[in-house]
Amino acid sequence: MRHRKSGRQLNRNSSHRQAMFRNMASSLVRHEVIKTTVAKAKELRRVVEPLITLAKSDSVANRRLAFARTRDAEVVGKLFNELGPRYQERPGGYTRILKCGLRTGDKAPMAFIELVGRPEDAEAVEADDSAE
């Protein structure tokens, strides 16, 4: 029985899941928006949001924890230099999942997962306001 077992298996073994979410988290931090399946996006939230919360208080210990979870120095730098200060006043809820239809090959439900308040969002809102 699966009682009290949280998280999705996604038909992968644990090392594959860990590597996949490590790579997806790095991609999301680097590009601030990625396209994936809805199930992976929902599970990715559980990986990325604690990383951003960790980045809100910059210390050597927190940087080492973030590096242990991402294994990418560039991503750790962006987390602590850009994302931590950006979300300093926000108490969680750093990601947004937008469903975007079905994948062509297998009809899997797809979604964009993005960081809220990213600079492109602000530019798009300003463009919409000026058009009206």
From Swiss-Prot:
<dbReference type="GO" id="GO:0006412">
    <property type="term" value="P:translation"/>
</dbReference>
<comment type="similarity">
    <text>Belongs to the bacterial ribosomal protein bL17 family.</text>
</comment>
<protein>
    <recommendedName>
        <fullName>Large ribosomal subunit protein bL17</fullName>
    </recommendedName>
</protein>
<keyword id="KW-0687">Ribonucleoprotein</keyword>
<dbReference type="GO" id="GO:0022625">
    <property type="term" value="C:cytosolic large ribosomal subunit"/>
</dbReference>
<dbReference type="InterPro" id="IPR000456">
    <property type="entry name" value="Ribosomal_bL17"/>
</dbReference>
<dbReference type="InterPro" id="IPR047859">
    <property type="entry name" value="Ribosomal_bL17_CS"/>
</dbReference>
<keyword id="KW-0689">Ribosomal protein</keyword>
<dbReference type="GO" id="GO:0003735">
    <property type="term" value="F:structural constituent of ribosome"/>
</dbReference>
<dbReference type="InterPro" id="IPR036373">
    <property type="entry name" value="Ribosomal_bL17_sf"/>
</dbReference>
<dbReference type="Pfam" id="PF01196">
    <property type="entry name" value="Ribosomal_L17"/>
</dbReference>
<comment type="subunit">
    <text>Part of the 50S ribosomal subunit. Contacts protein L32.</text>
</comment>
